[in-house]
Amino acid sequence: VMIGEFHFGALDAGLPATGLEGVLSQRDRGIAYCHYCEKAAAHPNGVGCHYFQCYDQFVLGRFDGENYNIGLFDICSQPYPDMMEQIKLCSSEIYEVADGQKEPCEEKADSIPMIAY
């Protein structure tokens, strides 16, 4: 199984929408990322997953009006430190999880209702 697109958004970055899966903060975005990726890696049929997307969407919206805080970086190319910290942790142990040497992350992010357009 290859997961082609997933994301988590929060409202603490100044953008008005979370996208498909809302969480409380940038740290929670990182926790959700780690939980999701490690669960996919631990699945016996898991091949990989692809985070969408690299940059936040512009506050005025893209062609269809979406303006979500779903990027690894803001629109000024600055990383979200709290999210990146969790991604680094996940990346450092993902192969051990995939190989069954380590259990996947069980910590879950604090979810909020989705805000999407």
Where are these regions (language model features)?
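Aromatic-rich peripheral "rim/lid" segments of glycoside hydrolase catalytic domains that contact
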Residues: F52-Y117
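Non-transmembrane alpha-helical segments in soluble domains
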Residues: C37-A41
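Loop/turn elements at helix/coil->beta-strand transitions in domains of secreted/extracellular proteins
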Residues: V1, A42-G48
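Active-site clefts of carbohydrate-active enzymes
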Residues: V1-Y36, F52
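Generic hydrophobic/packing signal
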Residues: H7-F8, N45, R62, Y68
